Regions:
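Regulatory modules associated with amino-acid/nitrogen control
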Residues: 65-390
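Divalent metal-dependent catalytic cores for phosphoryl transfer on phosphate-bearing substrates
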Residues: 1-120
Length: 390
């Protein structure tokens, strides 16, 4: 009831609202510990929703940061309840199954961290052993014939995982089932068949998990996001995995703008378009330009959006984090990806959030040397180039 009491006083109403709520609690005769708890909950009632939507919740630094703010499991549970109630009250359509899933996963991960910090950071071998057990169960089953002749499954999976530039990151993000699915997709890559993809429907949550693998190239992110945008997919999140053997496997979490997950989507046409775009047979830029032109005839104007680009090196221990706020439009990620290509920026994860006509895009990136982007002049040039494009 008190969480939005500060609205109307300032843009960041949670800070002043927290102070007002503490005064109210004091007048009601509540104990000092309850007063402090109420103040904390109101001050931080955006923490879990914004973190789950705009930060990489598989990055240990994210979980450590949230845990450091909430301090204990009881406060985390109370904050989770406030977050759920507030999100549901704002809008039933805004608090969809995807956002609920992200919020719940952030809560679960942070709770596990608070309960047993040492156990939370499991070794790579723990995940590989789980994947090995899954491989044993799948061996000989339809679609997994490539496992038949492999005697040392543990060594085989370890070798596969170690080809990623960030094997630890890959293992903590992917389930054992997905790791085996990736191996299956890679087993079908040949010189004449340079990419493979599969779309996994999540009907209850109303989104697709589109997994794409193949021979890596500089424009891969912009090629994929541009093609998905052309086919009217809304990209909500992406995990980007590049490998030392020149291959990639990327996962895009998407929903369709016009169709439900159980709707009729022409996957064959999407596959053919991917093939032609990857091989340079068609111009994705021209395709998007024509589609934007036709859609602009029917698009209604909305509120103005202030474009902004912020670049941080203190959010993640491993990555530079780039936050972009812009007017949402078809092909926005494609345009951002092209700018990143110019500056040799490699994307490892992205979180995409939209509120009305406003897009909040967060990218976890490295430079072409595999490190953070730290040069102040280079950072200014990146910011200006992105602002000019969006």
């Amino acid at each position: 009831m008190l969480h939005d009491i500060g609205k109307g006083y300032s843009a960041h109403h949670e800070a002043i609202g927290s102070k007002i709520a503490v005064k109210v609690a004091k007048r009601l005769g509540l104990s000092e510990s309850v007063q402090n708890c109420i103040g904390f909950l109101i001050l931080n009632h955006f923490l879990l929703p914004l973190t789950s939507e705009r930060r990489d919740i598989h990055d240990p630094a994210t979980i450590k940061s949230v845990a450091g703010m909430v301090k204990d499991a009881r406060r985390l549970k109370l904050l989770f309840i406030v977050s759920i109630c507030d999100s549901m009250a704002v809008s039933k359509t805004r608090f969809n199954s995807w956002r609920k899933m992200l919020l719940t996963e952030l809560f679960d991960r942070t709770l596990s961290y608070l309960k047993n910090t040492e156990e939370y950071f499991k070794s790579d071998m723990y995940y590989i052993e789980n994947a090995t057990e899954t491989a044993k169960n799948l061996k000989g089953k339809r679609g997994y014939n490539f496992l038949k002749g492999i005697k040392d499954l543990n060594g085989f999976i370890t070798g596969f995982v170690n080809q990623f530039y960030s094997p630890g990151k890959y293992l903590t993000r992917e389930s054992s089932e997905n790791i085996l699915l990736h191996l299956k997709l890679f087993s079908k890559i040949t010189p004449g068949h340079r990419f493979n993809f599969v779309a996994k429907p999540h009907i209850g949550e109303d989104y697709y998990e589109i997994i794409i693998c193949g021979e890596d190239k500089k424009t891969m992110f912009s090629d994929i996001t541009g093609t998905l945008s052309y086919f009217d997919f809304n990209i909500m999140s992406a995990d980007i995995n590049t490998r030392k053997d020149g291959r990639f496997i990327d996962t895009f979490f998407v929903n369709h703008i016009y169709k439900k997950v159980d709707g009729d989507i022409d996957w064959h046409k999407l596959r053919n378009t991917f093939f032609n775009v990857f091989n340079g047979n068609i111009s994705l830029e021209d395709m998007l330009k024509n589609k934007r032109k036709s859609e602009s005839l029917y698009k209604k104007s909305g509120p103005r959006v202030s474009n902004s680009v912020e670049i941080y090196n203190n959010i993640s221990g491993e990555f530079t984090v780039i936050e972009i706020q812009a007017l949402d439009r078809k092909g926005l990620l494609y345009d951002i990806g092209r700018i990143f290509n110019v500056f040799d920026i490699n994307i490892f994860a992205s979180k995409i959030t939209t509120q009305g006509n406003k897009a909040f895009d967060t990218f976890y990136v490295k430079n072409d040397q595999g490190g953070k982007i730290r040069n102040p002049l280079y950072i200014r040039k990146i910011k200006q180039a992105v602002i000019n494009e969006i």
